[in-house]
Structures are given as C-alpha cells and as structure tokens.
Amino acid sequence: MTLPEIKDFMPKDIAKDIIKEKQIRPDRDQYFMLSAVIAATRASCIKFNSGAVIAKNKRIIASGYNGNPPGVPSCHEQGFCNKDAAGVDRSSKGSGHCLATHAEANAIVQNHEQNLQGATMYCLHFPCNECAKLIASSGIKEVVYLKMYREQVPKAELIFNHAKIKFRQMEMHYDQMLKKIEQVMKSTKE
C-alpha cells in the first residue's frame, strides 16, 4: 500500500500533515533512549532524575528509575531531601543519607527471569562504580548513555574495560524527538 492509499484511511488533516511534513521515526537507539527519558519522569528523587532501559533482541525487557525501595518513604513523599535535612553535601557519596536505588540497578532488578547476557543498557548518565559492578555481573555487554555522571567514574570505565563491556555516549536531538512526540499527539486527536 502506498502513502497516497494509506491517507484514505486517516483523517484528512493528519494525512495532509504526514504527506507534506517529513515523518520522523526514531532509530532504535533513539527509541530506547527516549524510553529511558520517559522512565526518568517516574523518579522519586527531588534532586536528580534518572532512568534506564535494558534492551535485548530489539525489545525492551526492563526499565528503571532512581527511587526508594518499596515501603521506604521517598524524598518526593517526604517533601525534602534526606541529604539536605542532614546538612550533607549533595555530591558526597556513601553518606548513607540517600535511600534511593539508582535507575540502572532498578532496571536490572525489574528484569523478570530474562537472561541479560548480551543485552544493552540505555541510561541518561554514565553509570557510577556500584552500578558498573552490577552491569558487569548481569552479563550486559553494552552501555549507551547521554551524559557523563557528575563525578569522575574511572573505576566504572575500568570495570567495563575488564569485563569487555562497550560503552558509548549518544547524541540525542531533542528538538526532533519533541517534534515526533508532537506528531504522535496530533494524530491521537479526533
């Protein structure tokens, strides 16, 4: 079926827009990363939102965001950050005040009985050292990220190199992705 034939099955204004305006379709990397961004919108941390998606065989098999374990009140629920309340520098690690689980760790935990050998993790930030250990132990073989984590994470890179895990920074064209979301939302109007 050709595009002109397809337009007969769509509302006229939408069909016209699709024909005159180039339809944007994300490639797989963009799709999986956009899914990680969407996962981050569920983060329960009030200071730092992060999301992760694990893909294997061209499918999402797990996702996660930074948030507290079940039953543990989050900063979002409390209305304050535990680190701020304790007067701890936000960038300090291992103080024990932050009770959230990182997005990468949550994605691994949320994977239900799926073998992660050879999978790819898409995350907003380059993983910290602790998450790098979990990623290596899980069998994930590639990590794609948008930004470097706030701190230097040379141990994470070392872990990935020893475990032969590929890692690469991805460039995301936000304007194109927002335009695609807008196209999708327009197509849902009646």
Task: Identify the residue ranges that each predicted region occupies.
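Zinc-dependent deaminase catalytic domain
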Residues: 1-190
